[in-house]
Amino acid sequence: MTEKLYEQDSMLKSCLATVLSCAEDKRGYAVVLDRTVFFPEGGGQLSDRGTLGGVKMTYAVQRGSEVVHYCERPLPVGEQVEAVLDWQARLDHMQQHAGEHILSHAVWKLFGANNIGFHMGERLVTIDLDKELTAAELAQAEDYANSQIWEDKPITVSYLPHTELPALVMRKKNEKLTGTLRIVTVADGDICTCCGTHPLRTGMIGLIRINRFDKHKDGIRVEFLCGRWALEDARRKNEYVWQAGRLLSMKPEGVPQGLRKLQEEVTELNERLKAQTAKLYEFLAPQLLAQAAVDEGGTKYVAAAQEDCSAADARLLLNKLLADGRTVAAVVYRSGERINFVLGSGEQTQADCRSLCRKAGELFGGRGGGAQHFAQGGGAYSDDWRQKVLQLQQLLKE
């Protein structure tokens, strides 16, 4: 059994402990101590990390009554070692977890929304709510949560028998829990059963910042950050806005308007380019058809190679080539280190593009698929891809 010192003192940064066992597995060397300051991953909170006897400890997990610590090197059984926390990581995790309690209490108190899911990743924290809230409502909850932080309220841990829980005003009660339960309380605020580590006062959280929310099942998923993570995230995004402003030659507050104007200009240019491309293909298609192979029944077979071409442009040219209904055509175009192709057969032809696509895939070292009158695929780029297009025209006719 491992004594969990972090349950009584979340501010304890180190301790002396005796190595009870050490065994190698896929994750590293699994070390069990008689006591530990390291919180094992659980309850939505990330594992602590640090060192054991100077050896890097990267992950801790609870197995039964023991906490298993994964180290990069083995530790001698029976030896006393110093367990030292990566304190910055612990503080980051405490800020996120305590912030989650306070934000969850805010949406519950203000709007009756329940937190039904909590996840903490590296620089990403989410809660899932069982009802939808608007951006304005979330902003109100964010303001309320931050007011709880700035009032610097005490956060306390207590242990109570489960029979006393009905007397507490808790946002979430799990009636399946029995025995002595660990209760985390924010003064005049959230009360919740919790196994995690928390700062001593709300002021240590510093800040809660909601970044986004999305529809999730019958409610929403709220993405947020607290403390140092929130500060660094805001600093990074602020730099993005300043960079965008410099590129647009305007102040940061003008960036949204500048981007809208730029988007309108790009849309207009794309429409003009699309119109010019259509005109070009009106001229190019007859030239390509004039060079097409023709069988005894009058069906034309043509394969065109296009260097600078988008997928949409390739389809446009293909449609121009197929306009008479008696043509089998392929448009092959380069996209970076890939060669792509679109195949089509007119309604008055007997050609099956599925079969032609298999042949084209073999020719270009790739694959594709489709239906009788249209298919598409691609393969790897090679220097002789234009010569292969000439071969493809012959394959279309066979």
Say what each PLM segment does:
Residues 30-31, 64-73, 125-131, 341, ...:
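A generic structural motif
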Residues 1-79:
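Conserved nucleotide-binding/hydrolysis modules and their immediate coupling elements
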Residues 193-205, 228, 301-398:
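Glycine-rich, acidic loop segments that terminate in or are immediately followed by a histidine
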Residues 199, 211-258:
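A conserved active-site cap/scaffold subdomain adjacent to cofactor or substrate pockets
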Residues 59-60, 116-120, 212-213, 330-334, ...:
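Short beta-strand
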Residues 89, 108-218:
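Functional cores that coordinate and move charged inorganic groups
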Residues 242-337:
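Hydrophobic helix-and-loop "lid/oligomerization" segment in the mid-to-C-terminal part
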Residues 36-52, 76-127, 372-373:
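Active/ligand-binding-proximal structured segments within catalytic/core domains
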